[in-house]
From Swiss-Prot:
Composition bias, Basic residues: 26-36
UniProt GO cellular component terms: host cell cytoplasm; host cell nucleolus
Residue numbers bearing the Phosphoserine modification: 82, 89
Protein name in the entry: Protein Rev
PTM comment text: Asymmetrically arginine dimethylated at one site by host PRMT6. Methylation impairs the RNA-binding activity and export of viral RNA from the nucleus to the cytoplasm. Phosphorylated by protein kinase CK2. Presence of, and maybe binding to the N-terminus of the regulatory beta subunit of CK2 is necessary for CK2-mediated Rev's phosphorylation.
Compartment(s) where it occurs, according to its Swiss-Prot or TrEMBL record: Host nucleus, Host nucleolus; Host cytoplasm
Family classification: Belongs to the HIV-1 REV protein family.
Keywords per UniProt: AIDS, Host cytoplasm, Host nucleus, Host-virus interaction, Methylation, mRNA transport, Phosphoprotein, RNA-binding, Transport
Motif interval(s): Nuclear export signal and binding to XPO1: 63-74
Primary location recorded for the protein, binned into one broad class: host cell
Domain notes per entry: The RNA-binding motif binds to the RRE, a 240 bp stem-and-loop structure present in incompletely spliced viral pre-mRNAs. This region also contains the NLS which mediates nuclear localization via KPNB1 binding and, when the N-terminal sequence is present, nucleolar targeting. These overlapping functions prevent Rev bound to RRE from undesirable return to the nucleus. When Rev binds the RRE, the NLS becomes masked while the NES remains accessible. The leucine-rich NES mediates binding to human XPO1.
Function field: Escorts unspliced or incompletely spliced viral pre-mRNAs (late transcripts) out of the nucleus of infected cells. These pre-mRNAs carry a recognition sequence called Rev responsive element (RRE) located in the env gene, that is not present in fully spliced viral mRNAs (early transcripts). This function is essential since most viral proteins are translated from unspliced or partially spliced pre-mRNAs which cannot exit the nucleus by the pathway used by fully processed cellular mRNAs. Rev itself is translated from a fully spliced mRNA that readily exits the nucleus.
Highest rank taxon of the organism: Viruses
């Protein structure tokens, strides 16, 4: 059921390709305006399809976060190296973050 719904929504988006960049400025502007209006219609239609056929809303469920007082940044000497891992010599982390765990396994 989910795959069928996704295929229908994908077909709707594919049936509205972006406008061609040719013609006068006014013609291009009109084409973009009409394209954006169609995109909005497709977006609302796909939300309706999701809520009707799958019983869920198109909006994501808000993530429950802890209070700001309990959030801390635990930054030690390895700060700033996460973006450069795998570049140059291999680095050994003392404590591998959970987010990067799958990317650091070899």
């Amino acid at each position: 059921e989910l795959l069928k719904t996704v295929r229908v929504i994908k077909f709707l988006y594919q049936s509205n390709p972006p406008p061609r960049p040719e013609g006068t400025r006014q013609a291009r502007r009109n084409r973009r305006r009409r394209w954006r209006a169609r995109q909005r219609q497709i977006q609302s239609l796909s939300g309706w399809i999701l809520s009707t056929f799958l019983g869920r809303s198109a909006e994501p469920v808000p993530l429950q976060l802890p209070p700001l007082e309990r959030l801390t940044l635990d930054c030690n000497e390895d700060c700033g190296t996460s973006g450069t891992q795998g570049v140059g010599s291999p680095q050994i982390l003392v404590e591998s973050p959970t987010v990067l765990e799958s990317g650091t396994k070899e």
